């Protein structure tokens, strides 16, 4: 319904709960932990109070040792383990406060014996597959093995849903390279990540993850508390505006709002503000110059083609880079170089069309299936024209693969001026000119030539000069550097 009312197609991502640890139930729904007091934490099922409460993790007694920390409710409450006796973990309250049912529990810097997927994750994943959703945001991914467990279910159901691995703990950060190889993208989920690792490490980790995702050509989302104050206030803090801008400058593909739009007082204003910050950052901060010399650590033929296409587009000031793609991989490769030219992904797949919504700078169009390279390129250009993404006379860079319909074979670059070639000849000026053609046989009867007109005649003489001065360009059949047209052009 939202798509129809807005006239825009969107991609949809489902977020899994992941293998979380939470507090159990309390006698009065809550309790207050006093700083300096002792409280016992146990995996046993019981109604908790200020002296003892339960958590939903059976192996907590074996995974912890004296000196370890337990953080509750996004780190608002901190406990220090003093001793462990059977199923009872004795702790000292370092930071007290109110604790209640089902609050999140974090065990910083610990490798936990949690499953990759819980039953609810599997049910949610199957729901997303049935409804043909585009991505699954997999929570608390710790290693490539976790990604493969999710992939196994997706492939079992014959789905092509993309996996976005949420990096939310120290294990995920440590194993980011193998996660990036196996996932379709990553999310820097800074909420839980900022509890699991020291807050001062989060900015550095964010930059490293974004850089590694950029190098491999996988989309990366930066999320959590980006405009947190706008849950309550109509304007963000200056620090939040800088945070959004810096994520963009780091190279993130997407910036994500969560609580601001899900539960905040100003959801629409939050979106508008984030959009304004993003556009201003890319326009004013040397964003494209910063990325134009980006060199990946490992070159492949498709990657080299993408790099060359971006350099060509910059040198020729092309209006667009059109990538004919069946899987979307070529468009992702082009995107990572952050070209100034528009990136158009022409694909026959509606699934790929939607999934590319997440990739920086890519606008997708649906084309027909084609068996030949020329037909595929023509279809891509014509569809882009019909969608209003390019115009006749625009110079575009086109990438494609031969043979057609084979993924990962991008090996062709073509430079083309959009439009049907009626005549060709030699030009004296630079750049591309488009306008309304005015065919003139008699200058005295031509009437007024307007600034957007292109004057066309067999030849010119002194009587044509007033018309030529007003015209945007002129074309004559009688050529040569010593012709009247050429001499007049050089003198203007």
What are these regions (language model features)?
Residues 1-492:
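Non-catalytic helical/linker scaffolds that mediate oligomerization, partner binding
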